[in-house]
């Protein structure tokens, strides 16, 4: 009878054909391999030709060269510290002749990422206070990480300058932080994101005129503006003299000298590109300390000791530290899910908050020890984002969140009772 036909196929043809899944497997695997091949080609193509996210290759230094650099840096910092204390003593002694209640005042601005909007708002609110609780003219201002971006404006201290930085943080742009694209994860990249918008807006504010104002506000070097960044090569913090940088910017006509210091201090590792300054690679200052309150000093070189030697008959004036913490002082409680990324993020956040609290307690211990040694009275006052403050906004540099933080900061800044006076 012959084979029975189905269409144009015989029963034997159908019996000999492989199953449908086998027929589909080869095209599927071919497609997958093609995609992988294209990705590999793109990967190596980007590595070879796409250099936009990379810094130039750096010439390695020997251990001896790095050790010498570390030693020289430590000596320079110690010399600068002694010079600062010397002018503090003489400046305050002259001021004391006119005002027996004269004080030495330092403003410390911590890191905190986009939460720095709190600090900017706080200073703007504090500027509105009059009378005995009014903002003093600070003898020194220090800034770390996001606090470094606020510090120059706080150093100027005028209502216009304080409102300028508050206005800036209240209006973050979508391009302040942008990913580097599909291959953001390439290990050759300096970071997985870039900050073109933040650089643009910061450069618009920190120009040559701004640098000139910083130099004038230093009153001939009698006031200091210190920015801390982390020296990734030497594994230590470095404190930049931003007044000296501003002076150099004016002399050369290049404000990038000052801008790079500010951006180096705020360069979040991996996220934002580091900065190379004077042959060293710098990144976020909060890696070494989230706020800067001075370097270790031998007892014989302390402010109180120098004062007693130079002016033994004059009472040692009071030193006051005003610390603005651009974050919660303690991690906000959460129910953490047991997922590795959430665990890593929470761990890093907790470690920064813990080290910040330890540093604040250390500052209180220094204040107490200074008083016990007869080095004068030291007051420490601090403020942080209230633990009760909450937001539903998520994302980095979210405009609504930053405006809420600025508003909360302004409210507290206008309230003299907002300052904490005891260690956490």
Q: At which residue positions do the language-model features occur?
A:
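Catalytic nucleophile serine of serine hydrolases
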Residues: 144-145
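Patatin-like phospholipase
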Residues: 2-139, 155-424
């Amino acid at each position: 009878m012959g084979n029975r036909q189905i269409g144009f196929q015989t029963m034997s043809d159908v019996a000999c054909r492989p199953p449908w899944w086998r027929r589909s497997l080869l095209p599927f695997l071919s497609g997958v391999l093609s995609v992988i091949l294209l990705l590999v080609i793109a990967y190596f193509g980007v590595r070879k030709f796409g250099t936009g996210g990379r810094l130039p290759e750096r010439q390695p230094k020997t251990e001896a060269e790095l050790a010498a650099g570390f030693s020289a840096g430590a000596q320079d910092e110690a010399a600068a510290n002694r010079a600062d204390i010397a002018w503090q003593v003489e400046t305050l002694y002259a001021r004391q002749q006119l005002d027996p209640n004269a004080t030495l005042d330092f403003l410390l601005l911590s890191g905190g990422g986009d939460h720095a909007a709190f600090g900017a708002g706080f200073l703007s609110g504090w500027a509105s206070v009059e009378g005995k609780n009014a903002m003093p003219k600070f003898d020194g201002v220090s800034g770390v990480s996001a606090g470094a971006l606020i510090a120059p404006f706080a150093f100027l201290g005028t209502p216009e300058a304080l409102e300028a930085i508050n206005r800036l943080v209240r209006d973050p742009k979508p391009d302040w932080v942008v990913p580097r694209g599909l291959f953001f994860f390439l290990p050759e990249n300096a970071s997985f994101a870039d900050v073109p918008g933040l650089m643009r807006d910061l450069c618009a504010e920190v120009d040559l005129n701004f640098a000139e104002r910083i130099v004038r506000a230093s009153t001939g070097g009698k006031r200091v503006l210190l920015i801390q960044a982390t020296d990734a090569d030497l594994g230590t913090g470095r404190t930049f003299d931003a007044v000296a940088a501003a002076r150099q910017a004016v002399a050369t006509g290049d404000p990038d000298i000052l801008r790079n210091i500010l951006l180096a201090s705020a360069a979040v590792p991996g996220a934002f590109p580091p900065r190379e300054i004077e042959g060293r690679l710098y990144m976020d200052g909060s890696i070494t300390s989230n706020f800067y309150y001075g370097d270790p000093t031998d007892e014989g070189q302390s402010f109180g000791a120098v004062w007693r030697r130079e002016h033994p008959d004059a009472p040692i004036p009071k030193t006051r530290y005003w610390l603005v913490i651009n974050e919660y002082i303690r991690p906000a409680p959460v129910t953490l899910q047991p997922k590795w990324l959430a665990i890593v993020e929470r761990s890093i956040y907790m470690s920064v908050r813990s080290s910040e609290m330890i540093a604040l307690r250390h500052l209180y211990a220094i204040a107490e020890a200074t008083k016990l040694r007869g080095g004068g009275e030291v007051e420490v006052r601090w403020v942080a984002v209230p633990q009760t403050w909450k937001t539903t906004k998520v994302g980095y540099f979210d405009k609504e969140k930053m405006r809420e933080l600025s508003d909360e900061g302004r409210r507290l800044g206008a309230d003299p009772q907002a300052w904490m006076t005891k260690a956490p």
